[in-house]
């Protein structure tokens, strides 16, 4: 089964991907992870990417696609894969389709997880980290025993810049601008499966399984 997992920051893609990996025995492919791995291993495409990254430039689509193609050609992808965070744009989706076609493969389902903006803000702005040991907490879902104090080392709990409301709103705006055309693209192709990301981890997983088996 070849899946694409879409969803805004804070929707729970990582958690759901792990459950799907365990259930289907297929790898999760995150472009950030495979880009770093390709650069470290100096694969042909990794070497190209390193040149751009060393100069502070964005890695162009054709190099990212090449790295994705290298990864999809590996043996553990023969039974399927989960693409997480890729494609991000319609041109990337077109290029991915061409790569897969050349490999005799195609995307089976595109799962789009959605949660309303208020809930996403609550999930993300509530995150706290210990300034001393790095332990993670959440003011609503996983609070420390003493407010603002780490249970493990008594360090101060802080909110990262990435978790501040203004930063999150900007990230969500970028995601929506990029992904709206992509959702329309996959909907037109008959591949989109929309799943409500609000609920328990198990409940959302059941929703995903029902959607891809429908």
UniProtKB/Swiss-Prot annotation:
Binding locations of AMP: 31, 36, 57-59, 85-88, 92, 160, 171
Annotated metabolic or biological route of this protein: Purine metabolism; AMP biosynthesis via salvage pathway; AMP from ADP: step 1/1
Gene Ontology biological process terms, A to Z: AMP salvage
NMP as annotated region, ranges: 30-59
Residues holding Zn(2+): 130, 133, 150, 153
Enzyme type, top EC level: transferase
Subcellular location: Cytoplasm
Known EC number: 2.7.4.3
Region entry LID, spans: 126-163
Keyword Kinase attributed: yes
A single GO cellular-component term on record: cytoplasm
Residues holding ATP: 10-15, 127, 199
Major location (coarse): cytoplasm
Domain remark from Swiss-Prot or TrEMBL: Consists of three domains, a large central CORE domain and two small peripheral domains, NMPbind and LID, which undergo movements during catalysis. The LID domain closes over the site of phosphoryl transfer upon ATP binding. Assembling and dissambling the active center during each catalytic cycle provides an effective means to prevent ATP hydrolysis. Some bacteria have evolved a zinc-coordinating structure that stabilizes the LID domain.
Entry protein name: Adenylate kinase
Organism of provenance: Citrifermentans bemidjiense (strain ATCC BAA-1014 / DSM 16622 / JCM 12645 / Bem)
């Amino acid at each position: 089964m070849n899946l694409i997992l879409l969803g805004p920051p804070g929707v729970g893609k990582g958690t759901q991907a792990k459950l799907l990996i365990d259930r289907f025995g297929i790898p999760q492919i995150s472009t950030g992870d495979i880009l770093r791995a390709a650069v470290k291993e100096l694969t042909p495409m990794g070497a190209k990417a390193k040149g751009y990254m060393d100069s502070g430039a964005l890695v162009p689509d054709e190099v990212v696609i090449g790295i994705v193609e290298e990864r999809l050609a590996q043996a553990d992808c023969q039974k399927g894969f989960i693409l997480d965070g890729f494609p991000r744009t319609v041109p990337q989706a077109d290029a991915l389709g061409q790569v897969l076609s050349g490999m005799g493969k195609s995307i089976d389902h595109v799962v789009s997880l959605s949660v309303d903006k208020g809930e996403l803000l609550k999930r993300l702005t509530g995150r706290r980290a210990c300034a001393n040991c790095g332990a993670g907490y959440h003011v609503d879902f996983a609070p420390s025993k003493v407010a603002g104090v780490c249970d493990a080392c008594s360090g101060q709990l802080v909110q990262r810049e990435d978790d501040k409301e203004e930063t999150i709103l900007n990230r969500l705006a970028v995601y929506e601008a990029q992904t709206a055309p992509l959702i329309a693209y996959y909907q037109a192709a008959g591949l989109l499966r929309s799943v409500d990301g609000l609920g328990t981890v198990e409940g959302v997983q059941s929703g995903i399984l029902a959607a891809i088996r429908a």
